[in-house]
């Protein structure tokens, strides 16, 4: 089959995003399918440059990073359109020509018109709760979510009028060579506040900034060190360090796919909290990192 995947790795060319999308791309390719990655800026200042920590219109770093990453996976079909309409690689029309399947993994409907060329269009939701509360376009043939409870009586996530099917992110173990733990700490890479809080039906939902404080004193209760590679707004660094948490720069730990992979390989194990919206809604969130 000819499969087109839409995501946001040029806009956010960080190791964790590359790992997530890359494992889908790699998995489909291993099954013998022709795989194409597409992305569109969609608005001004949409591209993050991890070298400067700034958002802007210059997508050159992201394009170069993604192109090199795809080459490592043995892939070459790629197209990106910046905020001025300039195309890098394939045009959107060319990318979708003859497509059997379009998988939207964060393109946020930006290819709605071009995706009509695909025989089947599906949405894969990686942010259960946020996706449904913000509203979902009705131009997909099927809807999948890593919120395994969404659409059941166990979860309060609104269905937005569609049927949600549970799905697990693929894990390509060959991209992560087995190594003995190099470090002594349990770690995670996280954002304290990646974006603003969300209000739905009179209730406000937050992120990891509302969940991690519940475990603030955990380092004093266990023997192994606990480390947070952390970024985001309003991080209470002094409070966290005072409670015994070791802090690292999340952007440094995830600046590239190799940095991300090496940081994980050097960890004793993953210790993380979910975003508060995932917890409060009993979404059943289960990601590639959960696996």
Label each region the model flagged.
Residues 2-4, 123, 142, 163, ...:
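Generic structural signal for residues positioned in beta-strands
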Residues 1-12, 104, 184-196:
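Short hydrophobic beta-strand segments
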Residues 154-269, 277-279, 289:
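Conserved catalytic-core segment of nucleotide-activated headgroup transferases in glycan assembly
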Residues 103, 271-273:
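A short hydrophobic beta-strand element within the catalytic core of glycosyltransferases
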Residues 4-155, 253-259, 263, 279-281:
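Extended catalytic core of nucleotide-activated donor transferases of GT-like folds
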Residues 7-11, 82-83, 122-124, 198-202, ...:
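Short, basic, glycine/proline-bearing loop/turn elements
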Residues 16-27, 207-215, 285-289:
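Conserved alpha-helical elements of sugar-nucleotide-dependent glycosyltransferases
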């Amino acid at each position: 089959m000819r499969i087109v995947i839409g995501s946001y790795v040029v806009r956010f060319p960080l190791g964790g995003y590359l790992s997530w999308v890359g494992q889908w791309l790699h998995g489909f390719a291993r099954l013998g399918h022709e795989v194409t990655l597409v992305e569109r800026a969609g608005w001004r200042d949409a591209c993050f440059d991890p070298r400067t920590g700034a958002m802007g219109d210059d997508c050159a770093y992201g394009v170069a990073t993604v192109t090199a990453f795809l080459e490592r996976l043995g892939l070459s079909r790629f197209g990106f359109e910046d905020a001025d309409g300039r195309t890098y690689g394939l045009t959107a029309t060319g990318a979708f020509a003859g497509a059997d399947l379009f998988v939207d993994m964060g393109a946020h409907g930006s290819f709605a018109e071009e995706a009509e060329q695909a025989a089947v269009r599906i949405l894969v939701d990686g942010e259960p709760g946020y996706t449904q509360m913000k509203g979902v376009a009705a131009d997909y043939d099927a809807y999948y979510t890593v919120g395994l409870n969404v659409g059941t009586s166990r979860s309060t996530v609104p269905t937005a009028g569609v049927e949600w099917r549970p799905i697990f992110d693929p894990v390509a173990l060959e991209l992560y060579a087995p190594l003995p733990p190099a470090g002594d700490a349990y770690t995670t890479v996280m954002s304290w506040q990646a974006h603003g809080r969300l209000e739905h039906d009179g209730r406000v939902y937050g992120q990891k900034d509302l969940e991690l404080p519940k475990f603030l004193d955990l380092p004093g209760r266990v023997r192994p060190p606990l480390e947070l590679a952390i970024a985001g707004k309003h991080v209470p660094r002094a409070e966290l360090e005072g409670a015994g948490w070791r802090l690292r720069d999340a952007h440094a730990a995830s600046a590239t796919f190799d940095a991300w992979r090496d940081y994980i390989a050097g960890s004793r194990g993953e210790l993380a909290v979910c975003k508060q919206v995932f917890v409060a809604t009993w979404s059943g969130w289960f990601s590639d990192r959960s696996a």
